[in-house]
Every structure is written in structure tokens, then in C-alpha cells.
Amino acid sequence: MMMNGQKLAPAAEVAVQLPESKVAADNISGTMSGPLVGASGGGTTAAMRPFGRKAEVMHVLLRLLCIITSVAALSFMFTAQQSSTISIYGFMLPVQSKWSFSHSFEYLVGVSAAVAAHSLLQLLISMSRLLRKSPVIPSRSHAWLIFAGDQVFAYAMISAGAAASGVTNLNRTGIQHTALPNFCKPLQSFCDHVAVSIFFTFTSCFLLAASAVQEVIWLSRSKY
């Protein structure tokens, strides 16, 4: 019959060609949906997350250390007070020293409290993003914002530490060509508290500067 003779061969060809065309279509669709989408998604993630996981953990650690040092500076200065007696021209006079008697020390307390609050806020935000496995710095605008904040507070801590250092140095050395003595001899505990507070103040400044440098590196690597 013609069905058995002539029509059978074209049917076989169709049966053979259909799977080949289907395999080719599968290969094309796999190429379009697989490597291309994966490559673009990875590029976006890399652009949004220029830092690795370790760098983000280091960013959070810097915030935590800044909180500790700024709170320590605040605590030591806030507890700096002492009463004693001092000899001037042979007269024993009672003296009392307290951090609130100096505007420089009050300024250091205020700046340290502001830095502690700023660092705590940034730590909470960074920790929440880190636990959700999201980028700690989500965008360039956020990076610029925290960079500006870190710069402002770092300069404020420098000025507070410098002002407090001047007053402390005057207390330790006295005033030349006058009878004013070294006030830190009878007020040793007070001066020690102030010195430790100033040390933690400059340490906080260094940590803020390190955070700012990390944010500059992030801005230089990010594209979005």
C-alpha cells in the first residue's frame, strides 16, 4: 500500500526531527534563563555589597568598641571629683575639684554622650542587617550619611580631648611665676580620672576615623 510504502518514511523523519528541535529549544531557553540571569544577579549583588562578610563584621566591631570607649570616657569624667587641702603661702586651704567646674570637661561629657548614642544607633542598624544577611551599608546615600556623621563626631572628640588636655596640663604643672601650685598633688584621684577619660576620648576618635576610612573604601568600590 501507499501508506506502507511512501508515507512511512516522511513520518519517521518527522518523528526523528521533533526531539532534535525540542532539545535545541531547551538548550536555548536554558542558556537564556540560566547563565545570563545568574551573571546579572551576581553583578548586582557584588555592586551592592563590595565588602565581604568579614569586613562587615569588622564594621560592627568598630561600632561596639566605639560605644565602649565613649562610655568609658563619659564615666571616668563624670566620676571625677575630689576634696582635699592645699598649702598656699603657708596657709592650708580646703579645695574641691569636680568635672562640672570646667567648661572643657562639660564639653567632653556632652560630646562623649553624643558619640555613644550615635554609635549605639549605628550598631543596632548594622546588627539587624547583618543578622538578616543583608548588606550592612545598603546604598551610597546611607554610606555618605554615616561617613559625614563619623567625621563630625571624630572632629568633636578631637576638640573635646584637646580642650580637656589643656586644663589637665595646667592642673598638673601649675602657673609659672605665681604661687599657684600643682593641684594634682592633693587631687591625685581627680586628675587620674580625667587623664583616663581623655585617653578613651582620643581612642574613640581613632575608632570613628577607622569607620570613616572603611566607608570611603565602600564608596570607592560601590557602583549604586
From Swiss-Prot:
Spans through the membrane: 60-80, 107-127, 143-163, 193-213
Glycosylation sites: 171
GO cellular component: plasma membrane
NCBIfam families per record: A_tha_TIGR01569
InterPro entries: CASP/CASPL (IPR006459), CASP_dom (IPR006702)
Compartment list: Cell membrane
Record topological domains on the Extracellular side: 81-106, 164-192
Keyword match Nucleotide-binding: no
Cytoplasmic topology ranges: 1-59, 128-142, 214-224
Top-level taxon: Eukaryota
Subunit relationships: Homodimer and heterodimers.
Protein name: CASP-like protein 3A1
Keywords: Cell membrane, Glycoprotein, Membrane, Transmembrane, Transmembrane helix
Family: Belongs to the Casparian strip membrane proteins (CASP) family.
Membrane topology term: Multi-pass membrane protein
